[in-house]
Amino acid sequence: MEWAEYTKLIVKKCKDRSIPLSATFELTPYCNFNCNMCYIHLTEDQAKKQGSQLSTDQWIHIAEETKQLGTLGLEITGGEAVTRPDFPFLYEAFINMGFLVSLRSNGYLLKGKLLKLLSNYKPRSVHVTLYGGSDETYYKVCGISNGFTEVTKNILALKDSGILPKLTMTMTRDNISDRDKILEWAKNNNLFISLYGGLITPIRSAKRSIDHLKINFNGEQTYRNYQDNELIIRKVCNREKYEPPFWMCTEFGTRYCITWDGRMTLCNCLPSIWSDPLTQGVNNAFIELNKKLNDVKRPAKCTDCSFIDYCAACPSRFLSETGDYEETCESLCEKARIRFLKANAKQVHTDNMIDNDLC
């Protein structure tokens, strides 16, 4: 059996038995960057108005309960998780519990003692997001000096220590012109990089408008930005029309996220459907969360849509863009249409073209 097939089998068995195969711990809302499109970053005063960060002991307790459920993968994120003073202690504890730990980071602080920690207790993976191809772009997007210089230096140091970072570029209107430069840098250093342009409007405590930063991935522009990337032309998944709205989400039923203030959600982009692991315990909270998620209805517009097999119809995206889980947003509909056209060898001539035969 191939590894991909084996992984699908494990995920299916976990979903059938309601076992969380993996979890995300959002350790903090704080960050050393101040990215203008971030959905979570808070100042200390803002965070105090929203709640309290979980203590070291609370995170250890949650991790112990998570371990007892059979969870294997543990993703650590923030904010910037490594800004917590107790990060080294928590990280080492999670590793020693037997979790396959992944770290998401902006990469700026992954040097010195933190690099040594990661080298001694190697994670399953380190995901580093790039925000520009120059120090100037980093300052514009993240408000940080020497960002590109420091981050790329740390990425190469991770690689030299035996940790191969997985890179992502978050594309906005402020850094899209750096895309080719970043791709070239990654290629020259034999590093894989994925492109992400689907900015989600912040709906958590870091509420702000980011419409001016979003890239309109329509028509030919989609092809220019993604070229022949497989993500554009493949089906998202095959599914029946009667399936619930989380049918396309690989995390549903097999994963959860604990937010910095102690709520259990499906992911950190879906804040309003949650349970309380601190009072219920992790297992009971996971059961309650999935019951609540199952009650969410699919938008009526999706039922007979011609593009449904090519649509990453995410309820969290619906909520952030329309304020309602049951209302679709045009940006996702357009992306699904483009995938459909590309897969069926239709030529898109203009950014605003509508094919009436397919809509």
What do these predicted regions represent?
Residues 54, 85, 146, 174-177, ...:
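Residue-level signal for the nucleotide or nucleotide-sugar donor/cofactor binding architecture
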Residues 100, 119-120, 124-125, 129-265, ...:
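Radical SAM enzyme [4Fe-4S]-AdoMet core and its adjacent flexible, acidic
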